[in-house]
Amino acid sequence: MFWQGVPPDASYKAPAVMNLQTLRRAFEPALRRLLHVYWRFARGMTLGVRGVVLDTDNKVFLVKHTYVAGWYLPGGGVEVGESFRDALARELMEEGRIELVGEPKLHGIFFNSYASRRDHVAVYVVRQFRQDRLPEPNREIAACGFFDANALPLDTSEGTRLRISEVLENKAPVATWR
């Protein structure tokens, strides 16, 4: 399921979209470093949470952000005073209109050296949820949908692919995000 006109492997891109993507790719590493310098002083260590959301056909829910290239598991930062579960519930609702109806299962906590030397991500497996509809595109999420694990979009991140593989193939988690 995709938003109309946004297939995961679209080869045609309008010139304005190509220019925005080129600019984003050029500035993305610097922006990431700048944000992590801020977070270092504001928070010391950063914690994130992501969900491997699987429907009854074992299709996995992925999101495509407006500010970073590729497809990812839904999730985000854990706020001060917030539990991992509460952060997961908030992020799933914000990014996918997904409401937890059962308890998510912790898959693992991973060191994400790609983001910074202080970043850790808790990954949960979510099989019991409710979603009334896909969300409309917004300033954070450009597209989202459920995908067969054997037919993920080409630009799905390496860490996302690894987590999906671990969950669906019952593999032991690798300690780093990648």
Locations of regions flagged by a protein language model:
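Short, well-ordered beta-strand micro-motif
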Residues: V53, V123-R127, F146
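A short coil-to-beta-strand element that immediately follows conserved catalytic motifs
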Residues: E99-G108
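Nudix hydrolase/Nudix homology domain
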Residues: F2-M18, G70, R139-R178
